[in-house]
Amino acid sequence: MGYGSGVRLLSFLCLFLLISIGCRAKDYSLLHPLRPSPGICRESEIFDCGQVRIHWVAYCLDQRGLLPGVLIHPDAGGVAEDLEGICLDLARHGYFAAAVHYQRLENLREKNPLIGCKSFEEGSIAYRHLLEHPRVDHRSIGVLGFSKGGTHSLLLAAIEPGIEATVAYYPLADFEEWLDVSQYSFPKSLRFRAMRRHIMKELKVTTWEETLPELRTASPINHVARIHAPVLLIHGGKDHTVPVGQSERLCQALKAGGESCELFIIPKAGHVFNFRNEDQARVAWEKTLEFLDQHLKR
């Protein structure tokens, strides 16, 4: 199975992440409110490449000179505009920060489809766009993502050697392990069994074993040999959607391969904690800025 099938599966599984997270509201501006900001430029753009429509929102200082760039991917329920406050905050700290999400040209009725990119080449379009931006120093680019966007960022780091720093909040790192129903008690095991049946139907296979090549392709933990940028993983210690063990194993694998990885655990936090708890969000964001400054501002 190739990278394209892995991205298709990754997008499909995000449906179940949404189900697992539940209906509790998220506040994307909780720590990052949009306020008038003199000296900050905003740009927005919608452009097509192949069968993908990219929605792009970016902020940067209104001054001359190249800036380190950060590409930001939202969680499964978010769009680029939801992350404008984060982009604005990064711009105030001296970054060119762009948030993106994707649509399919064959079905523009869906604002933010689960399957936005059907190949890793499509998933790299926004990164290449950032790379070519006249305000961005192409030698200092990082990626940042939340949940689905964190997984996307890790996979980008595996296929784009120019990425200098990766920050992934509560990412799914190993789909095969996450979908192993033997670790779950009733009734949670029923939900994961149903999930497996849906995946088999989507992939048009009759046995679970036939899904494993795609699960492995979509899992960042199976690409650690290709991730050379320093990685910061931020995870809630009480995350019941994507357990912190996912990030623990990924970090261990990266370190075992001689790569730089740091795992920062917020002890009592759950999934998407930074859009629900301001105090937890602040601690995580301070760590994020410290990491990006260390690796992108040289």
Predicted feature residues:
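C-terminal catalytic histidine-bearing segment of alpha/beta-hydrolase fold enzymes
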Residues: 248-249, 257-298
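Alpha/beta-hydrolase active-site loop
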Residues: 113-134
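Alpha/beta-hydrolase fold nucleophile elbow
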Residues: 136-146
